[in-house]
């Protein structure tokens, strides 16, 4: 198949979110079933957003420095493969915290990089991103089924399949073209942050986002455990 074809861009979006769903939808349920309590589950699941605070700007900076969001994405996703293997065979709190937080933080950080690759492609980004939603939905349902029918650990095998496939797809797409500008604007990071946090509308936006996404994330984290506690199955969690 021709390099940088629509199929590779669609495949990147599909399998990226396909793999992402394995952890995002099923992590809390898995931790509950291996006998972690609510406090331990919240500690593990809340660590990912904290890791993301540092991972997202760092990977963005690396992508700009090396002018290759594609290469940065490949390295980051390869690290998630290694972390996933460690996560699969560990039941120690600190190891599960570090590995799961690293995986989810890197996926959060790679999301804008893959979007950047898709936007710069010769294809309609909406038609590329649509496949990400399809991949997430299919994976969530599939993970629920194999969780019940085979074994809970099987969802991490699905993650490996999705991540390795998205690595192959990213290898077959092109980096965004770098547009050189004649004039370079020099600015101080300190001054930029200072002016940003003096912007009242920006602060209000941050507060709204904080409470909105905090509530959504709390609900999304524990809904799987709640469904299981009232007699539901992992398949129902995947459907939700």
Predicted region positions:
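Juxtamembrane intracellular "pre-TM" segments in multi-pass secondary transporters
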Residues: 1-3, 173-207
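Residue-level signature of mid-helix packing/kink "hotspots" within the transmembrane helices
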Residues: 49-57, 136-137, 141
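Helix-to-loop junctions at the C-terminal end of transmembrane segments
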Residues: 54-68, 147
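Symmetry-related core transmembrane helices of the 12-TM Major Facilitator Superfamily/SLC fold
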Residues: 154-172
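Structural signature of the two symmetry-related core transmembrane helices
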Residues: 71-85
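Cytoplasmic helix-loop-helix junction between adjacent transmembrane helices
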Residues: 99-132
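Hydrophobic core of transmembrane alpha-helices in multi-pass small-molecule transporters
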Residues: 14, 83, 93-111, 210-211
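Helix-loop boundary and gating motifs at the non-cytosolic
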Residues: 2-49, 201-238
């Amino acid at each position: 198949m021709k390099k940088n074809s629509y199929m590779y861009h669609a495949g990147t979006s599909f399998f990226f979110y396909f793999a992402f769903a394995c952890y995002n939808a099923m992590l809390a349920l898995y931790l509950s079933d291996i006998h972690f309590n609510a406090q331990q589950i919240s500690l593990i699941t809340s660590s990912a957003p904290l890791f993301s605070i540092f991972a997202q700007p760092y990977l963005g900076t690396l992508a700009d420095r090396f002018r290759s969001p594609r290469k940065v994405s490949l390295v980051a996703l390869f690290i998630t493969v290694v972390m996933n293997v460690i996560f699969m065979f560990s039941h120690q709190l600190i190891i599960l915290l570090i590995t799961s937080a690293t995986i989810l933080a890197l996926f959060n950080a790679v999301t804008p990089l893959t979007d950047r690759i898709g936007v710069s492609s010769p294809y309609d980004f909406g038609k590329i991103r649509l496949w990400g939603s399809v991949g997430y939905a299919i994976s969530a349902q599939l993970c629920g089924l194999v969780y019940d029918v085979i074994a809970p650990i099987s969802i991490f095998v699905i993650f490996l399949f999705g991540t390795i496939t998205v690595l192959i797809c990213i290898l077959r797409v092109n980096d965004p073209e770098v547009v050189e500008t004649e004039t370079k604007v020099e600015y101080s990071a300190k001054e930029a942050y200072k002016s940003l946090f003096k912007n009242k509308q920006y602060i209000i936006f941050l507060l709204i986002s904080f409470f909105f996404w905090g509530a959504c994330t709390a609900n999304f984290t524990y809904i799987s455990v709640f469904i299981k506690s009232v007699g539901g199955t992992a398949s129902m969690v995947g459907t939700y």
